[in-house]
């Protein structure tokens, strides 16, 4: 006997001014299509009077398409002044990973993607160096070398944006990509580009952060994953974590501990974004874990 295909799953996220009737309107539309809610999370920001919701649901096969659902939901969105996203949960986000010379975050992302822990579709790796090409090749992933110098920076960013368009990229991940992107590129990819910062923001920005941390005698080493904006390392924070250290750790040991934290923090941020669990709330985020 042939096992019937499972019903398609969708994820709906909404953000809007808070008022009565929002949940009723959303669930009412799903009921008209025999939708079954599999997971529902909501948050009411009382300080900003903003309402946030994430719903994962299924509908019977052949009953509706994601495009027609979006069209129907636009009526509700207009009524409640909502911003919303609706995705087929079985279609992974097309993802482009940017890296420079340090490959620990790239290695972690590719390993998790390869074993199915990250629901993304890695479409390629971009780098201003060749160091990580063998790693990408070991996973059968295209490696795009875009050298960056003061003279070629504009061309390199134009090449990056061309790849984003031609590969139909939804998510760009800066996995220790050590180039400052222009304001125009940051704005073009706003809300879909994640960076890992090698410190617990806002501390120790710039070069040699672990040497800065050592000189200050820190007791915690951390990392921050955030959306990229035109304000350097000031974008909305998705995830942070720390590990305890002490006077016995030299700068190299701090850096080794930091690499572990960076990899874990970035992978969590990418997973939550790929599962539509992160909603922007002004300069902050709401993360439905």
Model-derived regions: residue spans:
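Adenosine-nucleotide cofactor-binding segment
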Residues: 137, 141-167
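Short internal beta-strands
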Residues: 120-131
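A conserved regulatory-domain signal marking ACT and ACT-like small-molecule sensing domains
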Residues: 1-93
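Short hydrophobic segments within beta-strands
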Residues: 15, 96-98, 126
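Donor/substrate-binding cores of folate-linked one-carbon enzymes
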Residues: 129, 152, 156, 169-289
């Amino acid at each position: 006997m042939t096992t019937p295909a499972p019903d398609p799953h969708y994820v709906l996220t909404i953000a809007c001014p808070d008022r009565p009737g929002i949940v009723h309107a959303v669930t009412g539309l799903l009921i008209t299509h025999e939708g079954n809610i599999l997971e529902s999370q909501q948050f009411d920001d009382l300080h900003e009077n903003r309402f946030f919701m994430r719903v994962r649901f299924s509908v019977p096969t052949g009953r509706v398409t994601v495009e027609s659902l979006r069209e129907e939901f636009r009526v509700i969105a207009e009524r409640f002044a909502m911003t919303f996203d609706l995705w087929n949960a079985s279609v992974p986000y097309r993802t482009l990973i940017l890296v420079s010379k340090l490959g620990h975050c790239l290695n972690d992302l590719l390993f998790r993607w390869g074993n199915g822990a990250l629901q993304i579709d890695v479409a390629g790796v971009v780098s201003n160096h060749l160091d990580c090409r063998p790693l990408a090749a070991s996973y059968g992933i295209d490696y795009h070398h875009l050298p960056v110098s003061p003279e070629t920076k504009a061309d390199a960013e134009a090449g990056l944006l061309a790849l984003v368009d031609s590969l139909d990229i939804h998510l760009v991940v800066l996995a220790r990509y050590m180039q400052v992107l222009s304001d125009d590129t940051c704005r073009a990819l706003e809300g879909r580009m994640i960076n890992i910062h090698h410190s617990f923001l806002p501390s120790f920005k710039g070069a040699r952060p672990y040497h800065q941390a050592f000189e200050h005698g820190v007791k915690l080493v951390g990392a921050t994953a955030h959306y990229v904006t035109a304000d350097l390392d000031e974008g909305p924070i998705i995830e942070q974590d720390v590990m305890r250290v002490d006077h016995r750790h030299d700068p190299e040991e701090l850096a080794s501990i930091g690499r572990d934290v960076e990899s874990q923090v970035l992978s969590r941020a990418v997973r939550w974004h790929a599962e539509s669990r992160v909603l922007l709330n002004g300069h902050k985020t709401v993360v439905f874990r």
